[in-house]
Amino acid sequence: MSLSSLFNGKYDTKFLLNMSSAAKVELIVEKVAALADACLETPLPTDWFRNILDPELEFNSNFEEIHSIGDEEFAQPLPFLPFRVLLITGTAGAGKTSSIQTLAANSDCLITATTSIAAQNLSGLLNRTKSAQVKTIFKTFGFNSSHVSMNERISCSVTTLDSIADQQKHDLSTYWNVIADIAERALNAANGKTKVIPDLCESSVIVIDEAGVILRHILHTVVFFYWFYNGLHKTQLYKNRVIPCIVCVGSPTQSGALISSFNPLTQNKDVKKGFDILSALICDDILSNYCKISENWVIFVNNKRCTDVEFGEFLKHIEFGLPLKPELIEYVDRFVRPATYIRNPTNEIGMTRLFLSHYEVKSYFKVLHEQVELTNKDNLFTFPVYFIIQNKAFEDYKNEISNFTLEIEPWFKTNLHRLNTYSQFADQDLSKTIQIEEIVLDDGSVEETLITCHLKHIKHSSIGVTSRTKSSTVGFSGTYEKFVELLQSDLFIEKTACEYSVHAYSFLTGLMYGGMYSFCLSEFTTSEVMTEIRKIKLPNIDFLQTMTAEVSLQTFDESDEYYDLHIAPTDEEMLASDPCPDPFFLKYKQLPLTNVLTFEEISYLYTVFKEIFISRFAILQRHSKEMFGKSNLITYNRNNVSSKRCGEICSHVKSFYGMLTYAVPANNYTLEGYTYDNVIFLGTDKMLPPIIYKRGLPKIVIKDEMGFISILDNNVSKLTDTVNGNSFHICTTIDYAIVSKVAMTVTKSQGLSIQRVALDFGNDPKNLKLSSIYVGMSRVVDPNNLIMNLNPLRLNYENDNIIASHIVKALKNKDTMLIF
């Protein structure tokens, strides 16, 4: 008997599953509180953190590249740094995030994540303000861009590690180049006048979301910096000898941590699979016994996002490593479609294609773009991407690596994957031909080399951003019904941090002001409709009569809006030639600037315009038998805007005025077009050389899932390579920080919930792994939205689920907390 039949359909299955697990989720708080009560019986050695011997010397006395912290003459061996761990695991959609929300709401803890996407997703779920955004665990302990090129050590001296203390030192030694650099900087900063207290001094409870994608040594790194920072700043936590409790959250069966390294001497990269934190906590006997994982493990069992019984049963068999019955293998046959059908871009346009390799993704994009170019060329955008090479830094870099014959072009092609987010250039249809030219300054000197490539994207395709990107929200595109729903629910206001609510009210007021005249132009508007519209009460707003539109630009800050109203014709001038003038614009001729109004005045203006807008909507709905609400509304903030066939979006006053916001990787966006017009307060322009603008640098226009239109700031990133302790800023990349979601690798899709998926495993897949099958198929919530080119379970595949047997053992353990 199913849950839904038990309750006669009164409650849906998702609701029942969530409610049934709520009580146990609250018990996690008690579990964490108990672990966080532990304290050291005896203190750590006095000032141990000021002079620390390189731990590699304890395993290999002949080690030459010693990097001790502090004064090497007084350096002492690192003492063992104790810690506690609570492990929280479960499949996709099982409720792990709800446990983090409960911990954040009911305990004093530091919430972090392993990736920027996970961190920003948590920030949204926890409704964090801009000043309290969830950070990545790397940023939390002090990692920055200069550490990216610091390779991890590969120790060959240790064969067996018999104690947790030895294991801790060995893991710290692996990452010691980064640890020592961060610690040295912290010691120097502590001697300065201004002291910034690190986040790790806030609480002894540290939550790490998506812990399965980072290597095991990061666990000991977090423990090290907890004790290091608290000791350095003499916090109450350190004085009370409070032992940290690390809460590791993730899915060990679908995770995979990678070790990547780059050898500047050979210009070769190496990527291989590593041992992640979750796998180490579960499989490593020494670590598992020390942390008492058998007692401190919480497992979420049921996938609450997917309530299809058969599909959930199938995923559970793979998750827990249960034998696959013949009927389950036959069940997967229903998803199979011909490979030619899936690979044809004209079929299943709304589906995201998932492939096993970057090469297959890139090949699909090439076919797709060729087809779009033939059928509708205006829908294919080609955007330039620029790379500025610093000539002197490049020459110094060549000398440092003793590769004197290295040229810019081969270096560029070899290092393309390092110049920006790897998958952005590995997956996308980036032009093979590159243009290389020297940038000649006014005095005739040449200091930089410019490399130009081109990326292709499709209009109205699904995209994401590669990092948190500054944007200006300037408009709305959707149905009248959707816009009115947003106004009535105050959803946009609620999603805006409270300190910026005044700008949210002003922005929505500007959208209503810009969209008000569209009621007069609707195909459903008749003389009777206009008569009723004229009868709508238009209150007198005294401050609108006294406000002046002239405000000096010097009085603005980055969060203010700027409306260059004197450039555009006034509404009174536009209405003078209108045979059917709109009484709204005759009454309210100008909309004042945000920074000359009080919050009370802006909120009053918003309330008045909202009542007028909704009243007009109700009139049109009634006269059109509710057909008007389905029609499209496109409105921009106090601006008239037009769109060209080629996709360029133009403001009639050559500027866009919007609300400063941020696009984040956790969200989905639609590519609307691009613009060359000025966008107030997107300040990348000042950072770039004039030659970039002469070549052409558009700004990307996107639409979010609610329908709000934003213009993205251009993305500027720098590649700094570190060799022998010396840093070289070699290249600056100027692009758009966007990546297509039309197709991607299965690995990249991990952690994403995708509406509709078409899986392509290739014609004869080699090295097919069960984890890839699981990740690809579990992206969908509804199995009716999944198709595949073959049934991978009928092929030879590697069962790489080494965790499954441990999970099954834990399920039988009475001390494991199971949450269904």
UniProtKB/Swiss-Prot annotation:
Keyword Nucleotide-binding applies: yes
Key words, A-Z: ATP-binding, DNA replication, Helicase, Host nucleus, Hydrolase, Nucleotide-binding
E.C. designation(s): 3.6.4.-
GO cellular component, one term: host cell nucleus
Superkingdom of origin: Viruses
Role noted for this protein: Component of the helicase/primase complex. Unwinds the DNA at the replication forks and generates single-stranded DNA for both leading and lagging strand synthesis. The primase synthesizes short RNA primers on the lagging strand that the polymerase elongates using dNTPs. Possesses helicase-like motifs and therefore may act as the helicase subunit of the complex.
Protein name: DNA replication helicase
